[in-house]
Amino acid sequence: MGQKVHPYSLRIKINRDWKSKWYFDKKLYSEILHEDFLIRRETMKFLKGIRFDISDIEIIRNNLQRVTVIISTPRPGSVIGVKGANLEKIGQLLTRKISKKINIKIKEIKKPEFDAQIVANGIAKQLENRASYRKLLKSSLLSSISKGVQGVKIKVSGRLGGAEIARSFEVKEGRIPLHTLRANIDYGFAEAQTTYGVIGVKVWLFKGEVLGKQTNSDAGQVINKKTSREKSEYFDKNRVDDKSKKVVNDDKFSRKKLEFGSKSNSSFKKKNGSDV
């Protein structure tokens, strides 16, 4: 499981949620899934000029005839347009495509350095502008680390710098615990369309752990671990108590044993006719 590139699949309902939220009859599943794909494709096609500013498109359905589309972006003004012109055009376009009422909402990303998709989009955009990939990756990594991200890993693959043979280049800072399911790891992927071909950009961001290691579910408080001194005192105390209990039990056992032994000796002497 540690070889999984995309960390979301193992963390659904742990610290990640579905990007399409709806539940309908299984007969309608394929149709609605195709509509979701169509909504995302047409939205990105319409916003092609600012596609690098789009982080995520979330789809929520409460009934068959109403669809809510939430677009996450660090620049909501460029998506909304002048007096909401872009939103109105996108709504009309999607309504014609799927024949359902579309409600579009904008979600602002206040910290772009904490969003892996935005970081990947920024790198891809600068690669298309012929920026040096080595300096670009290092500057993006340092920018995220300086903002408080605990771990960053960036990987680019393709004909880097116009080389004839495709290869990969990777930079990493901090830790990326892919095996730890409580770790909040964000992932983003983008493609840079260069004159030499397509360059893929992958970004992993570790933003801390969302679930504690030891928690008390009843009280909702963190359980403090005992120090080694407290542990030794605790075990010494229990060991003394156990010994004292053992001694008491041994005394009772020995007393019973003596009584049983005296009775058995007296009965043996009576049988043999000797005096007690």
Curated annotation (Swiss-Prot):
Family annotation (Pfam families): KH_2, Ribosomal_S3_C
Organism of this sequence: Borrelia turicatae (strain 91E135)
Keywords: Ribonucleoprotein, Ribosomal protein, RNA-binding, rRNA-binding
Domain KH type-2 residue range list: 39-110
HAMAP family (UniProt xref): Ribosomal_uS3_B
GO molecular function annotations of the record: mRNA binding; rRNA binding; structural constituent of ribosome
GO cellular component: cytosolic small ribosomal subunit
Protein name: Small ribosomal subunit protein uS3
Keyword Glycoprotein applies: no
Lineage: Bacteria, Pseudomonadati, Spirochaetota, Spirochaetia, Spirochaetales
